[in-house]
């Protein structure tokens, strides 16, 4: 028997099983346009998702034949309303991600507000908002996710406020509990306000508030405030041994704005990794430390070259690590602490990379006037800084004590002191070296 493919204008939206980490089908509520209203619904028992904003750049199905949708882009459509909904007994709860497209998905022109979503008794993951411009208020996630598929993962900046995460509740009575992670630190940039964490402890083998993940762009502006805890003392899961972590994973950081994590205002929760910790840090919280530092991202670009070899990361206090970039990425990245002279950071590159003849280095996700000293080792003898506003310091000590935006050559190394300019969490600086 032969079958004929239906015409596009009458075809149904695909509804077979689609497997992905950030989104999977089928979905109980399969939402192809953001301009819809969902109030007081319950989704249960899906092998895929409870609610999936699976938006394409252009309309599909029977909408193709309707002239009023001809210029509509569902992916960028205005947001309708979403409140007082529940998901239980589903493999995933909620996603605004496009299947197999990385951190991409529904991006409304105005901030989408998801209010009072409750998720319980779920599978390996719960909530994935892939793009920014979204806020979750009174989000409740319990008995959902596992150690490596966290209850909440966001590749782009979103806000979570007045919310609750419970690792294993009374629903787990009878030895049905499991190791869990509340929030996976992906590219991130998530603003956490007044969030309560319950039972992230050693029960059932250990559950963690935060879990480190690799990221194409390690966003370090992850502020948290008003954090409260109940039976919780495992803050951080590295997911790997320090020697097996890439720079984007060891740089997964949460900034504690008000001290509610325990060390003080303006401190940070970081991986227990030699490139992140120092004498300001506390004892271990799981596999993390609280440190009296603020951290920014340093990005190093060799004229867009991809397939970069590993680079050696150093600190002047004797610590070092080998940084393996993500495959086919056109930059190195490193997360560094700012505004001190206890040590500086250094990088040693492969000779084949240096053959490119230029290096552009930027500091990102900083505060205004943040400074950091970087050393580039084994540089060609004719290497110099070609950036307007940078001046040459007399020596290394003068550079470190100076106001920033200076450089100096010392032997085979070039030292630079960057100084960020801009708004809080969005300040930047950039310096170009050529040879």
Kindly give the residue locations of the regions a language model identified.
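Intrinsically disordered, low-complexity serine/proline/glycine/threonine-rich regulatory regions
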Residues: 69, 99, 124, 131-435
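Feature marks extracellular polysaccharide-active and adherence modules
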Residues: 2-4, 31-32, 39, 44-49, ...
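Acidic/polar low-complexity surface segments
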Residues: 1-31, 48-84, 91-109, 147-149, ...
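Generic detector of short, locally flexible boundary/turn motifs and exposed helical patches
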Residues: 16-18, 125-129
């Amino acid at each position: 028997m032969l079958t004929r493919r239906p015409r596009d204008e009458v075809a149904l939206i695909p509804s077979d099983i689609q497997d992905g980490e950030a989104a999977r089908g089928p979905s109980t509520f399969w939402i192809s346009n953001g301009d819809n209203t969902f109030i007081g619904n319950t989704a249960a028992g899906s092998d895929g998702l409870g609610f999936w904003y699976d938006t394409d750049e252009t309309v599909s199905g029977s909408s193709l034949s309707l002239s009023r949708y001809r210029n509509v882009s569902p992916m960028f459509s205005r947001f309708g309303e979403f409140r007082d909904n529940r998901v239980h007994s589903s493999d995933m709860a909620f996603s605004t991600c496009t299947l197999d497209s990385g951190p991409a998905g529904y991006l409304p022109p105005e901030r989408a507000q998801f209010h009072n979503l409750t998720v319980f008794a779920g599978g390996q993951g719960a909530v994935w908002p892939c793009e920014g411009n979204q806020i979750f208020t009174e989000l409740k996630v319990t008995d959902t996710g596992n150690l490596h598929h966290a209850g909440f993962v966001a590749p782009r900046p979103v806000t979570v406020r007045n919310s609750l995460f419970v690792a294993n509740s009374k629903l787990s009575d009878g030895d049905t509990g499991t190791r869990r992670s509340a929030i996976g630190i992906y590219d991130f940039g998530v603003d956490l306000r007044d969030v309560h964490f319950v039972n992230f402890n050693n029960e059932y083998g250990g559950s963690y508030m935060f879990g480190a993940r690799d990221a194409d762009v390690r966003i370090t502006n992850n502020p948290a405030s008003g954090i409260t805890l109940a039976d919780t003392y495992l803050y951080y899961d590295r997911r790997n041994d320090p020697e097996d972590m890439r720079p984007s994973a060891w740089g997964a950081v949460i900034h504690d704005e008000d001290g509610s994590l325990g060390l003080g205002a303006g401190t940070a929760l970081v991986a227990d990794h030699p490139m992140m910790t120092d004498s300001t840090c506390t004892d271990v919280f799981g596999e993390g430390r609280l440190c009296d530092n603020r951290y920014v991202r340093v990005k190093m670009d060799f004229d867009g070259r991809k397939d970069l070899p590993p680079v050696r990361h150093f600190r002047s206090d004797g610590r070092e690590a080998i940084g393996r970039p993500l495959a086919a990425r056109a930059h190195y990245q490193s997360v560094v602490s700012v505004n001190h002279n206890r040590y500086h950071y250094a990088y040693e590159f492969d000779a084949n990379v240096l053959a490119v003849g230029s290096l552009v280095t930027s500091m990102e996700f900083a505060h205004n006037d943040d400074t950091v000293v970087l050393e580039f080792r084994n540089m060609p003898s004719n290497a110099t800084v070609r950036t307007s506003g940078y001046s040459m310091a007399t020596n290394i000590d003068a550079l470190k004590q100076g106001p920033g935006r200076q450089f100096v050559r010392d032997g085979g190394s070039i030292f630079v002191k960057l100084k960020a300019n801009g708004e809080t969490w969005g300040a930047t600086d950039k310096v170009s070296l050529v040879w």
